[in-house]
Amino acid sequence: ALMKTKLFINNTMASSGIGLETDAIKAAQAVYCQGQICMSEEQEALCPFDRLEGEVAIVVGAGPSERRRLLLKVADVMESKTPKFIEVMAMEVGASALWAGFNVHASANVFREAASLATQIQGTPLGFAVPTEAFEMATPDGTGALNYGVRRPKGVIGVISPWNLPLLLMTWKVGPALACGNTVVVKPSRINGLFKDAIDKGAKVVCGGMAQGAVGVLNYLNRVNAVQPGGTVISLCGPASAGFDIANDSVYGLSSGDDMIKQLTPLGFAAKPEDNVEPYLLGASRKQGKGITTTVISIDGGMALGAG
């Protein structure tokens, strides 16, 4: 049977508004398989970002305990779909059943670990919003002062996952981001179009207990230009050159800098040089064959951590 993947935006499976589709292929055999990928363009890509930017409360509003319950449910659903994941990973990645099964099991455990953190992030197992760090400090008047910090969600997290480990290298970004109360927009590799169908089902489980748009899943983008300043973080796996390519193919242009930390100068958002935000590519290696690294682009200049 012909499998057709769609976009997952605002809790709804939708076809591309511009009607673009591309054939899926079996990477292992380099032949076409029975499926078509619904491609997304700029208007669809911007939709989840526009809706979520600055509205983190829609995820936080679910509450830490509810986020924990949802993430545990996602893990169970994921493992129940193991045979389907194995089948699709064999077609698209050429993975053996043993390797694909391991990835599903490990990915489910990532969500379980993330679930265990959901009620701890704000400093209490009961999930109340209390200061997470506090210390007393002497003051000249002798009364003393209490300093404390409160953890808050970053905002919208854009996740770009690679073709070779499409599940594991996606879940260990998505799980912690949701546990911390962020909203997430996922863009799998264009090669993993059929694999995305299984991802969508997990997204629907998460969104079932959250406000509309907590998770969005897009397909292939002709241009990675859905990035916007103001709290957006893009997390991807690969060498620094991958981040540079994405930056060059988006609304951001590269300026000079060393190989390990590159400044990205946004175009079209800043009228004056002093208004430019300064996102960075962090912890990336430009040398190939050095294992998996993570490139994290923080659009508001803050330092965001990711795994890859």
UniProtKB/Swiss-Prot annotation:
Main location per the UniProt record: periplasm
Cell compartment(s), UniProt: Periplasm
Regulation of this protein's activity per its record: Completely inhibited by HgCl(2), CoCl(2) and CaCl(2).
Superkingdom per UniProt: Bacteria
Pfam family, one: Aldedh
Keywords attached to this entry: NAD, Oxidoreductase, Periplasm
Coiled-coil ranges from the UniProt annotation: none
Annotated PANTHER family: BENZALDEHYDE DEHYDROGENASE YFMT
Protein name: Limonin dehydrogenase
